[in-house]
Amino acid sequence: MRLVFAGTPEFARIALDALLAAGHDVPLVLTQPDRPAGRGLKLTPSPVKQAALAAGIEVAQPRSLRLDGRYPDEAAAARAQLERVAPDVMVVAAYGLILPQWTLDLPRLGCLNIHASLLPRWRGAAPIQRAIEAGDAETGVTIMQMDAGLDTGDMLLERAVPIGAQQTAAQLHDELALAGGQAIVDALAALGQGGLAPRRQPDAGVTYAAKLDKAEAALDCSLPAAVLARRVRAFNPVPGATIRLPGLDDPVKVWRAQALEQAAGGPPGAVLRADAQGIDIATGQGVLRLLELQKAGGKRQPVDVFVRGWQP
């Protein structure tokens, strides 16, 4: 099947690799423009662009696909490239640009999206993090026929993935990326044989995964410890949960924490204990034990190392 692939981060790169390994013809890739990265803020290509160039695939990087937007010339050039390629399907995975109607209509079989949740739960920008934050027992990937709405299109295939009790967003991301790559390969194989029946998303159970905000990173110790522990996992590695500790001017990043089912024994935010076993923080309900931390400008440290250089 002749495909155009549109995606940007590592999640999408894994899907592109899976499509190429399955033997699909991918003559064109769309990805976001190169961005400054690292301490030197050097312009860096996306993981998808790097993979495409390594495979000898043509790459387009329009800043917008809207013909009536801020970059109409770039959108028109991308449209000309797509029309020349004449794809059967466009596969979209974490691309980062809104697809206007002309884009949805151009491929013979439309545009298929790899979404990192079991729709209609967690439509939107941050489904992996929000699933962990909410305490969901499972999530998954959905292959969806794209329409003009926000993750509202008909579902073609779903694959459920359990969420581990201590699993971080980074770990779940990697698992879902692999599941998504296999799911899109399976979906295209079934689609080519006429074996996929689109299913309308149910009206019940719709939730939205709002984009992550840096302000959310600061742990509010008036919340229950269980909620805070989930946020530590959900925000690992980005934006990274933080907490303020006495004696330190800057917030400390929390990489790993555990909720203890015991009485707080102090006002929210109070340090109840600090030793090699952990730093116990009183919360609105229960105790949050900090297990791995990082001072501003420092390195990640297990708590037994951290406490040797800090006293409350």
Curated annotation (Swiss-Prot):
<comment type="similarity">
    <text>Belongs to the Fmt family.</text>
</comment>
<dbReference type="InterPro" id="IPR037022">
    <property type="entry name" value="Formyl_trans_C_sf"/>
</dbReference>
<protein>
    <recommendedName>
        <fullName>Methionyl-tRNA formyltransferase</fullName>
        <ecNumber>2.1.2.9</ecNumber>
    </recommendedName>
</protein>
<dbReference type="InterPro" id="IPR036477">
    <property type="entry name" value="Formyl_transf_N_sf"/>
</dbReference>
<dbReference type="InterPro" id="IPR001555">
    <property type="entry name" value="GART_AS"/>
</dbReference>
<dbReference type="GO" id="GO:0005829">
    <property type="term" value="C:cytosol"/>
</dbReference>
<feature type="binding site">
    <location>
        <begin position="117"/>
        <end position="120"/>
    </location>
    <ligand>
        <name>(6S)-5,6,7,8-tetrahydrofolate</name>
    </ligand>
</feature>
<dbReference type="InterPro" id="IPR041711">
    <property type="entry name" value="Met-tRNA-FMT_N"/>
</dbReference>
<dbReference type="Pfam" id="PF02911">
    <property type="entry name" value="Formyl_trans_C"/>
</dbReference>
<keyword id="KW-0808">Transferase</keyword>
<comment type="function">
    <text>Attaches a formyl group to the free amino group of methionyl-tRNA(fMet). The formyl group appears to play a dual role in the initiator identity of N-formylmethionyl-tRNA by promoting its recognition by IF2 and preventing the misappropriation of this tRNA by the elongation apparatus.</text>
</comment>
<dbReference type="InterPro" id="IPR005793">
    <property type="entry name" value="Formyl_trans_C"/>
</dbReference>
<dbReference type="Pfam" id="PF00551">
    <property type="entry name" value="Formyl_trans_N"/>
</dbReference>
<dbReference type="InterPro" id="IPR011034">
    <property type="entry name" value="Formyl_transferase-like_C_sf"/>
</dbReference>
<dbReference type="InterPro" id="IPR002376">
    <property type="entry name" value="Formyl_transf_N"/>
</dbReference>
<keyword id="KW-0648">Protein biosynthesis</keyword>
<dbReference type="InterPro" id="IPR044135">
    <property type="entry name" value="Met-tRNA-FMT_C"/>
</dbReference>
<dbReference type="InterPro" id="IPR005794">
    <property type="entry name" value="Fmt"/>
</dbReference>
<dbReference type="GO" id="GO:0004479">
    <property type="term" value="F:methionyl-tRNA formyltransferase activity"/>
</dbReference>
